Amino acid sequence: GGIRILPPFITSGTRGGEKLYTTRLEALVGVKNFVENCGADHIIISDCNMICNIDFNDALDNHIANDADITIITKLVNTNELKFPLDKYIKVVNYNGNGEIVDYASYDRQNGELHINTNMMIVKRSYLLDLINESEARGYDSFSRDVIRRNLGKHRFFAYEYDGYFNYIDSMQKYFFCNMKMLDSSKRKLVFHVKNRPVYTKVRNSAPTRYTSDAKVTNSI
């Protein structure tokens, strides 16, 4: 168990020899050796540009109860309430009453409430190994196109709805916006003050900022 941070571009043994990956699926092919030997029954795959405080235990229980091959963690958003429009690379997920995914497509400027892929997912390790081997054999490179869309209705793909605070950073403007959001105590509590889910940050014992008599500071943490 636990978190394993794998160095990027470990692609030895992938098709074509040493190469730099450009997609999620190519990156997974590059860490095939780790997947083979990690010993876990299920693996959580996540991007690193999301802001949220999530307990994966409930999502994992849901994944196991559904006997899912892949469980995609989704978030319900209302496009009419967003400060920034959704990126075209965001995936929209539709699922039935049992949580089974029935449609998966790129965002196409739809308005209203949408279930979007948070780019966090739980995958059965044996299934992931089969995906990696098939991708190597057939030259697949897109997780969305070659795995999810190709196998919808054939394999067990489920959604798990995350209902906590969520945002993602895909630009400098969004980075600034998300930081400014943390000045709002109600938003800050949703990230840093969730019961039994503390956020541990790195201690930086550096010299404090010096404020002179003519400094003007407002709305600062």
Question: Across the structure, where does each feature detected by a protein language model lie?
Answer:
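Conserved core of the sugar-phosphate nucleotidyltransferase
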Residues: 53-126
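Left-handed beta-helix
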Residues: 126, 134-221
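A generic secondary-structure signal
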Residues: 30-34, 62, 76, 150
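Short aromatic/basic micro-patch
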Residues: 21-22, 53, 121-122, 142, ...
